[in-house]
C-alpha cells in the first residue's frame, strides 16, 4: 500500500474481503465475509461479518454490520468495531446460504438501529433536516 492509501483509507474492494475486525480492546471479532453496495444511493451499505473463534454453532452464519459503524486502523490494516463479542453474536444475522431480501429497508433499518447508526437513506431528501442545510 502507498502512503496515500494509509493516510486516506482508500483501498481496493478485494482487500476489504477477509479483513480482520477487532474491538477497541483488541479482541478478535471476526472477518469481513462480504460487503453490500446500495446502488440507488451510491453507498457502501453494510458488511457481512463471519465471527471469530470461540463461537460454537455459529459456522455458516453471517452478521450484518452497517459500514459506518467501522473505523479503520491503517497501522494494523484492520477494521475496528466498538462492540464486545457477545453483542456481535447477538446482532442481526443470516445464514451464509440464505441471504435476506437485500432491498428490505425495514430489515436493514433494524440492523442500523442495533448498532446505533443512523440509516443513510432519506438523508438529504426533500423535507428532511439535511435537505434544508444544502
PLM feature spans:
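Peripheral interaction segments used for macromolecular assembly
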Residues: 1-134
Amino acid at each position: 500500500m502507498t502512503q496515500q492509501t494509509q493516510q486516506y483509507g482508500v483501498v481496493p474492494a478485494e482487500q476489504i474481503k477477509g479483513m480482520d475486525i477487532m474491538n477497541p480492546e483488541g479482541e478478535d471479532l471476526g472477518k469481513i465475509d462480504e460487503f453490500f453496495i446500495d446502488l440507488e444511493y451510491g453507498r457502501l451499505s453494510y458488511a457481512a461479518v463471519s465471527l471469530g473463534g470461540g463461537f460454537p454453532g455459529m459456522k455458516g452464519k453471517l452478521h450484518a454490520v452497517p459500514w459506518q459503524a467501522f473505523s479503520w486502523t491503517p497501522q494494523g490494516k484492520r477494521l475496528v468495531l466498538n462492540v464486545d463479542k457477545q453483542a456481535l453474536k447477538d446482532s442481526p444475522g443470516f445464514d451464509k446460504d440464505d441471504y435476506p431480501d437485500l432491498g428490505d429497508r425495514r430489515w436493514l433499518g433494524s440492523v442500523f438501529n442495533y448498532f446505533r447508526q443512523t440509516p443513510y437513506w432519506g438523508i438529504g431528501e426533500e423535507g428532511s433536516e439535511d435537505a434544508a442545510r444544502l
